[in-house]
Design a protein with these regions (language model features):
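Iron-sulfur-associated redox domains of electron-transfer enzymes in respiratory
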Residues: 60-347
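Iron-sulfur cluster-binding cysteine motifs and their immediate structural context
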Residues: 2-9, 14-39, 43, 47-63, ...
């Protein structure tokens, strides 16, 4: 049976009940004195992997499969989540890309490119929509939570692919459909998303995976001298690089021709109350919610590397954005990002 993105290693479980107490959706049960994940209830937020004192809650490896893809396909691009700027802060862009290319990747592209197209399409969608509450599809944990635990709000999720999937579609359109795309970021739930869209993203790995991979291959990014080709392809992202911080999506949502009330909230503990309380305003306004499961945004994802404060991480993201103006972007109007979300049948 295929492993889910998060699973239990029974031999390591000491029956301490910490994950049972900490799980925000009560998706863990005890069997034979071991704590197992209830797959039908899990939203893959990764909190259990952070609180387990013995490492019994494991994150599924993606590096082994990625190696096979690199060995068998000539063109493989790494889609790098925008929080890289606060996770590898001691490296230049060129050094990080050079290190990734040493692993065998053809090139490195910013997931934020996909985020920018998502923002544009969401803006258009909101302009044409009736008053109501609309929720971003960018965070896969939030999407899973709503589909399982707030099913009546599933129709409120904007019917757009996430930035990761949008980016993969852009890359395949630009370089050809035979291109293979691997994603790297701080989010465990992206592994689930990749499982559901295998035609777009082959594998999702974490920043921890990437760092460990460098170490195993004896690659020291900080010692590398970048070559001329060690830059982001096919172009560098602009405003999309703000996506990993709370509120980072909102600047890209156009509310000029039609008034859109834009708000951002993070932390799962807030999500349910936010949605429920704003229901009372759905007849009056067009309300767009950027909801992120991790406190402070993706910069605080469960598979993050850096333990730096959220304030410093946010600062680093904003500094990176300020240092890199908008690129000239080709017309992407022909790329379809629409999708549908259905509530799970949890009966």
């Amino acid at each position: 049976m295929d492993l889910k993105p998060i699973y239990t290693e029974p031999e390591n479980c000491q029956d301490c009940y910490k994950c049972v107490r900490e799980c925000p959706v009560k998706a863990i049960q005890i069997e034979d004195n071991k704590a197992y994940i209830i797959e039908e209830r899990c939203i893959y937020c990764g909190h259990c992997t952070q609180v387990c004192p013995t490492g019994a809650k494991k994150i599924r490896d993606g590096v082994s499969r990625t190696r096979l893809i690199l060995q068998n396909y000539p063109r493989v691009i790494l889609s790098l989540a925008p929080s890289w700027a606060c996770e590898f802060e001691d490296l230049s862009i060129g050094q990080l890309i050079a290190a990734i290319r040493k692993l065998g990747f053809s090139g490195v592209s910013e997931t934020a490119i996909g985020a920018e197209l998502v923002s544009s399409r969401v803006s258009d969608y909101l302009q044409q929509s009736q008053p109501g509450v609309y929720i971003s599809s960018a965070c896969p944990v939030v999407v899973e939570y709503i589909r399982k635990y707030s099913a009546e709000h599933t129709p409120a999720i904007t019917p757009m692919l996430s930035p990761m999937l949008a980016h993969a579609r852009i890359l395949k359109d630009y370089y050809g459909n035979d291109l293979k795309v691997i994603f790297a970021g701080p989010c465990i739930c992206k592994k689930l998303e990749a499982d559901h869209f295998k035609e777009l993203v082959e594998v999702a790995i974490t920043f921890k995976d990437l760092k460990n991979w460098f170490e195993k291959e004896n690659i020291h990014p900080e010692q590398l001298t970048p070559a001329a080709e060690d830059h982001f392809i096919p172009w560098q992202a602009g405003i999309g690089s703000l996506y990993p911080v709370e509120g980072g999506m909102l600047p890209g949502i156009d509310g000029e021709s039609k008034k859109i009330v834009k708000m951002a909230f993070s932390d799962l503990s807030n999500i349910k109350d936010v949605i429920k309380n704003l229901d009372t305003r759905r007849e009056k306004d067009t309300i767009f919610l950027e909801l992120l499961a991790c406190k402070g945004g993706c910069i605080n994802g469960p598979a993050k590397l850096s333990q730096t404060s959220l304030a410093i991480k946010r600062y680093n993201i904003q500094q990176h954005r300020a240092a890199h103006p908008e690129s000239t972007v080709p017309d992407l109007g022909h790329i379809d990002l629409t999708t549908t979300f259905k509530a799970y049948d949890c009966s």
